[in-house]
From Swiss-Prot:
This protein's encoding gene: RCF1
Taxonomic source organism: Komagataella phaffii (strain GS115 / ATCC 20864) (Yeast)
Name recorded for this polypeptide: Respiratory supercomplex factor 1, mitochondrial
Pfam families linked to this entry: HIG_1_N
Main location: mitochondrion
Annotated compartments: Mitochondrion membrane
Length: 152
């Protein structure tokens, strides 16, 4: 029994760790949708520039290389901006999680106090019952109904 690891409320299991690689990629793409779009557009610009170089069309190749630089810059701006926005959302989410944890702790404390009060009431009832039983026993002894000594 001692070797069994029981879950703890202090263990903060990150659901991101349990995801597969494709799920992680999809999760990140949903977080910052402009970054994959920018990467795809940059790849298209590089492919078209490579096509221009292969065919010898220097003007077209140069145009697509310029587009590539611009699209990479926009992708970088989208990445930094998305990270900033996501960080702000995480801060507010963290505050919300802390509030929920505080409420949960307060609820547990209230339940614990109720349990202690219930146990206290039960102890008082048991003491009162024992006191009444002792009083009844004393009353029976004084009237002679109950004899503690065995017959000789």
């Amino acid at each position: 029994m001692a070797s069994v690891n029981y879950p703890s409320s202090f263990d903060k299991k990150d659901e991101f760790e349990d995801m597969s690689i494709l799920d992680k990629i999809w999760f990140r793409c949903k977080q910052q949708p402009l970054v994959p779009i920018g990467c795809l557009a940059t790849c298209v610009a590089v492919a078209l520039a490579a096509k221009g170089v292969r065919t010898g069309d220097r003007v077209n190749a140069q145009k697509w290389f310029r587009w590539r630089v611009g699209l990479q810059g926009l992708t970088l701006v989208a990445l930094v901006g998305g990270s900033y926005i996501y960080d702000r959302q995480q801060v507010t989410q963290r505050k919300t999680d802390e509030d929920l944890a505080r409420e949960k702790a307060q609820h547990r404390q209230d339940l614990w106090i109720q349990e202690l009060e219930r146990r206290d009431q039960e102890t008082k009832r048991n003491k009162e019952r024992a006191r009444l039983a002792r009083a009844r026993l004393e009353a029976e002894r004084s009237t002679g109904i109950l004899d503690d000594e065995p017959p000789k």
